[in-house]
């Protein structure tokens, strides 16, 4: 009877809740968990759908609104972000009062509101929104003042803009304050003042994106003398191919309105704001490319960041917006292929670069294309692309032409043509004698073939001086000691390499050899078997299997 009464009361209570609180359906824990898991895996669309479900269940859920605001930004949906931002500000407010509960608003909400107001030509509201970013994860006085300065970046209000920048402490982010003074004066057509501040900023630091903006300024304003001297003064360390692409431009402004100037501040925020987490850094990059679409350097840096987060699909999408003829175009194409490669899809990486070189004869693209063919053991195709790279490298006097000869040497060594391999490896060293990887590769090859042992040791020691504690080079030196019968010396070095690279098949194979020579036969067989298990390319499986049966 007691159980029946309790059951009846529970049913009555639940019915009452459903009748009187239809507007509130408690969110399920599972919704939060799925949203969290999707967010961690960069699946922002799925995450957004689950938070939208939570929001429908409880429109005043501040957590759901704040997450929807951020996720909309990450998804590149500024319109929705702005909508959620205003909902967040008004959540729980008295609808009869024409006000917002601004305490609900997050720093990213104020940021999005400011961008929206500026885009709607409401500078006063934009300034107020940016000025409200004084707390939370985006709190930085220089960041806020630069945002506000761009709100007033107009010939009629430029004094107000400069007054805000002048509030930034002397020496604190000096370079960026000079850059933004130059950009704002440039936008306001104060040519002489812009020129002064460009010169001052470049005397402190020479970032490529600032150089690009400065050259655009010189080109637009027909400052011929400085424009003609630009390459010698600022690009002398770059090769001719890079210079040609950099200097090929039209006279269109890169920063065409204050909102695009805000994009540069958002790009700079990574240097200004301390302890940014990955999500907020991602948000700021996304807002930067949305607000300043003409500054392609932001896209390139953002894509590198996305690849580090293993968000390769979005990285490729961002890179695809960089024009192929831009000075970063070939590097963007290579990074797109790298993103495919990170996913284990070298075939797509090759297809992408093949398409690119039809449009642009690029040394870097052909070199990268040769590398991908080498990874796939397409020896003939690798050599063909390296030959293209060599022609372009000689034409433009590329400093890293040694790298092409090095890779050609690797192809010939792997395809059992040692004479050509040795010739190209030596040619590489002749062009650049302090290349640790080339010294190590040639030295190790000599040792493995029992040739030029003393010369090989000198090469490996030189490599070790250039790259101390590199586990591959340490392994090569250990292999030298093994070959000359100094097994204890070899053992201590291999233990270091094994700690650094426990999953490298060559190191495990070498470690097994040394253990066998020192009488630890059972343990040696364990490491030989491990080498076979780790050898995905089956380079020396048969050789190691013989050792498992017979020893050495």
List each language-model region with its residue ranges.
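Canonical tetratricopeptide repeat
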Residues: 67-68, 112, 147, 180, ...
